[in-house]
Design a protein with these regions (language model features):
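Conserved pre-ATP/AMP-binding loop-to-beta segment of ANL
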Residues: 57, 179-198
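A short N-terminal helical cap/helix-turn-helix that marks the beginning
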Residues: 2-21, 39-60, 76
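Structured catalytic cores of enzymes that bind and process phosphorylated ligands/cofactors
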Residues: 32-35, 123
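Conserved AMP-binding/adenylate-forming core of the ANL superfamily
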Residues: 37-41, 50, 58-112, 129-134, ...
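AMP-dependent adenylate-forming
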Residues: 20-30, 47-70, 195-197
């Protein structure tokens, strides 16, 4: 027989996971089995970033040296990267876009931007040398590679078939991703999306 505590815990669980709860559970059939899932959760990583930008707007999300980026700043920068990839670099749904750089705020923003653009982020090992990077690019069929200065230099003179966009990671995020987004400040791209307006 359940104790009073068991009953209270079950009631709390049902409030949280039941209809209208913050973690509403549903089920989905996969491979002949019914599996539980959170039915009101964002469906992909780009939607998660939008969700957390709306929830935590100005709270710090990424830190690199002296640069601190809020959830809102990361989301807006990633939207600009996505627009730049589509409009400026012709990225279409399913295109593989390589990422060859060290850990940095611009890596995270570029990764999210690739996903928002519909691309498939192809992560290339930052320790690889030119031939290894080229092999990874060729094997993945990446049409575009976003690289930091050091990784881009390793690819010079090595055949790989991709367009390389070089980012200067010593710059603040807006300037670091400018080779992707373009130098113009399109107000439509800079305006906060509905999730981030307060």
């Amino acid at each position: 027989m359940p104790s009073a505590l068991d009953l209270r815990l079950e009631a709390a669980y049902n409030l949280i996971t039941g209809p209208g709860g913050p973690i509403q559970l549903g089920s989905v059939e996969r491979f002949g089995h019914q599996l539980p899932f959170i039915s009101n959760a964002p469906t992909n990583l780009a939607d998660y970033v939008a969700f957390f930008a709306a929830q935590h707007g100005d709270a710090t999300f990424l830190v690199e040296g002296d640069e601190r980026l809020s959830f809102k700043q990361v989301y807006m920068a990633a939207r600009q990267v996505a627009a730049g990839l589509v409009e400026g670099h012709g990225v279409q749904r399913g295109d593989r876009v390589g990422l060859a750089m060290r850990n940095a705020n611009a890596w995270c923003v570029s990764y999210i931007g690739i996903l928002m653009a519909g691309g498939c982020a192809t992560l290339l090992n930052g320790w690889w040398q030119g031939g290894e990077l080229a092999a990874g690019i060729l094997d993945s069929e990446a049409k575009l590679v976003i690289a930091d200065v050091q990784r881009a230099a390793r690819l010079e003179g090595v055949e790989h078939g991709a367009k390389i966009v070089t980012l200067d990671l010593t710059q603040p995020i807006d300037l670091a991703v400018a080779p992707i987004t373009g130098s113009s400040r399109d107000p439509a791209r800079s305006a906060p999306p509905p999730c981030c307006r307060r």
